[in-house]
């Protein structure tokens, strides 16, 4: 089970960027190998937060379509928020959203994470 962070979807559907192809290749490889990809409703909210204020509705729609097509989407539960709070002392460099991603992963037994955020990836491995 692989948790897919918001930035993977953003790079996959976004403007030209050095991480665009690695994001797309990861998603294609996962699809070919029938990897179980998961994410959370919080990741979808992050897409809204990134694209709505700048009027990039078409990109938002593409990203949301990709999320729904390729991943199992978890709700964020009160227990996830409570666990995120307990993780803050171990990972003070993570923001609230990444703490929530980490909490969702830990509570559901995620074995791998795909993110281009080195801080989140490091916290996941620790």
Curated annotation (Swiss-Prot):
Under Pfam families, the record lists: PIN
Which domain of life does the UniProt lineage start with?
A: Bacteria
Protein EC: 3.1.-.-
Q: Which GO terms describe its molecular function?
A: magnesium ion binding; RNA nuclease activity
Every PINc domain range: 2-118
* Residue numbers binding Mg(2+): 5, 98
Keyword Isomerase set for record:
no
Q: Does the keyword Cell cycle apply?
A: no
- Co-factor(s): Mg(2+)
UniProt keyword annotations, A-Z: Hydrolase, Magnesium, Metal-binding, Nuclease, Toxin-antitoxin system
- Matching SUPFAM superfamilies, A to Z? PIN domain-like
The family classification in the record reads: Belongs to the PINc/VapC protein family.
Q: What does this protein do?
A: Toxic component of a type II toxin-antitoxin (TA) system. An RNase. The cognate antitoxin is VapB23.
Q: Which HAMAP family match?
A: VapC_Nob1 (MF_00265)
What name goes with this protein? Ribonuclease VapC23
Species the sequence originates in: Mycobacterium tuberculosis (strain CDC 1551 / Oshkosh)
Identify the coding gene.
Answer: vapC23
